[in-house]
From Swiss-Prot:
Membrane topology: Peripheral membrane protein
Keyword terms of this UniProt record: ATP synthesis, Cell membrane, CF(1), Hydrogen ion transport, Ion transport, Membrane, Transport
PANTHER family attached to this UniProt entry: ATP SYNTHASE DELTA CHAIN
Molecular function as annotated in GO: proton-transporting ATP synthase activity, rotational mechanism
Source organism per UniProt: Lactobacillus helveticus (strain DPC 4571)
Matching NCBIfam families: ATP_synt_delta (TIGR01145), PRK05758.2-4 (NF004403)
Gene assigned in the entry: atpH
Taxonomy, superkingdom: Bacteria
Role description: F(1)F(0) ATP synthase produces ATP from ADP in the presence of a proton or sodium gradient. F-type ATPases consist of two structural domains, F(1) containing the extramembraneous catalytic core and F(0) containing the membrane proton channel, linked together by a central stalk and a peripheral stalk. During catalysis, ATP synthesis in the catalytic domain of F(1) is coupled via a rotary mechanism of the central stalk subunits to proton translocation. This protein is part of the stalk that links CF(0) to CF(1). It either transmits conformational changes from CF(0) to CF(1) or is implicated in proton conduction.
GO CC list: plasma membrane; proton-transporting ATP synthase complex
Flavoprotein among keywords: no
Subunit annotation: F-type ATPases have 2 components, F(1) - the catalytic core - and F(0) - the membrane proton channel. F(1) has five subunits: alpha(3), beta(3), gamma(1), delta(1), epsilon(1). F(0) has three main subunits: a(1), b(2) and c(10-14). The alpha and beta chains form an alternating ring which encloses part of the gamma chain. F(1) is attached to F(0) by a central stalk formed by the gamma and epsilon chains, while a peripheral stalk is formed by the delta and b chains.
Keyword Transcription: no
Name recorded for this polypeptide: ATP synthase subunit delta
Length: 182
């Protein structure tokens, strides 16, 4: 029975994570995999070529060798493993799964700060730092989403937590109180 995309990503992501952690190169491998992901997203033809069933193994290996020369032995070995087992089509999913494991280990979370106006980097950092401190995390990376309909304040969504400090929500609560009192 064939594995689903999620199962392949989970297995290979966990294998890479375990290998990098055991060899004490986790941070370096993480950095390289994030760079690789950016490059592959910018140039999706790389995955197309390396997962093309028509191309022979030698041509794929030659192509991969040209790409991987800037990476560590660990990442090179992993990329060769993906090529050998014909898993290159799953590369971005594998990297994403690896990143989830890395973030969990390092108490890093990502989320969204929805505001009525755009926040600058310093404001986002302070919001993230405050959330991280409150929820015992090392780092919270926030992306700013602008939604003028919330009127003001901020809605923070990080992992499974939502903190709605928007003016719209506060007005809604006040309205509900007034209606309940009458």
């Amino acid at each position: 029975m064939a594995l689903s995309r999620e199962e392949v990503a989970a297995r290979y992501g966990a294998a890479l994570f375990g290998y990098a952690q055991d060899n004490k190169v986790l941070d370096n491998v993480y950095d390289e995999m994030m760079e690789l992901k950016k490059a592959v997203i910018a140039t999706p033809q790389v995955i197309s070529v390396l997962s093309d069933p028509i191309l022979n193994s030698k041509d794929k290996k030659d192509f991969l060798t040209a790409i991987e020369k800037n990476f560590s032995e660990e990442v090179q070995g992993f990329l060769n493993l993906l090529l050998e087992y014909d898993r290159f089509a799953y590369l971005v999913d594998i990297i994403d799964q690896f990143a989830v494991l890395y973030d969990d280990k390092n108490k890093i979370a990502s989320g969204t700060a929805t505001t009525a106006v755009k926040l600058d980097d310093d404001q986002l950092k302070r919001l993230g730092d405050g959330f991280a401190k409150k929820y015992n995390l090392n780092t919270v990376r926030l992306e700013n989403k602008v939604d003028p309909s919330i009127l003001g304040g901020v809605i923070l969504q990080v992992k499974d937590r939502v903190i709605d400090g928007s003016v719209k929500n506060k007005l809604k609560k006040i309205r509900a109180q007034i209606i309940d009192e009458n």
